[in-house]
Structure formats: C-alpha cells, structure tokens
C-alpha cells in the first residue's frame, strides 16, 4: 500500500514539475523576448544613432519608471500565478491554451492583466534608459496586440467559451482595470 502511495506522490510530483517547466517555457519565450531579446537587438542596432543614458536616479522620471516596474512585475506575477492555479493543464502560451475561462485574481478586473504588466515593464525600460527606440517598440507591441486580440484571440475565445466569454468581454475592459471585480 505504501509503495503505491509513494508511486502516486512521485507521479503527482512529476506532473507538477512538468507544469512548472511549461510555465517557465512560456515566460522565457513570450515576455523574455519582448522585454529582453528585442530591446537588446534594438539597442545594438541603434546605439550609434541614439544615445542611451540611465536617467538621473534623483529625478521624478526615475520614480515614475520604478512605479511602472513595480506595477508591471506585480501584475505579471499575479497573472501567471492565477493562470497556474486556475488554468488546469493549459498555460498562458497559445500552444497549450486553458480549457476553462479564467475569471479570478486580476482577471476579475481586466481581461489582459499579464499583457498589461508587460506593457508597464516596457515603459519602465524606455524611461529608465531614455530610449525613444524602445518606446517605439512599446507602441508597436501595444498596437499589434490590440489588433491581434480584437481580430484573432477574441474570436477564438468566443468559439471556445461562448456566451461566458462574451458576457465577460462586455463587462470587463481589455486593459483598464475596473474598481469592482467581475461577477458572473
């Protein structure tokens, strides 16, 4: 009996480890490229044309950038944890979508809190390094995601979750948080 129980715990531990690995892959591929790889490429391609200077650490802009950093990290971490705890076998990555609509945690207040966190982190980078090219990358990424969500992801979510998603979409903003949580 104890051997079977040990096997069960070992199997469950392997499943949890595989799920954590899937989430690590999602974080590494999606936000990792948006926040690190692409800004580094932009930096190396534009370093001769633009000067990159850290902003004065005593300036108001520095504290504004810190606010973007804190809120961005908080939203991103809270969103990923909520996905992890409520997403079943799915992940935030499009290659393994969740099987049920997540309306918990930050998703009660806005439909795309994880992406909003990434937007804030890109703004943090562009302000901290006084970088117009990285700010332009933020604008391209922001507009591209709005286009993608409106024209592709929302259609898929309506197909997968039907009226539950349309009710949620009609009552919860894409990026601007509401003051009260969404209730079904």
What are these regions (language model features)?
Residues 112:
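Extended, alpha-helix-rich binding/interface surfaces that flank or overlap catalytic cores
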Residues 1-104, 116-184:
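Membrane-anchoring alpha-helices and their flanking helix-loop junctions
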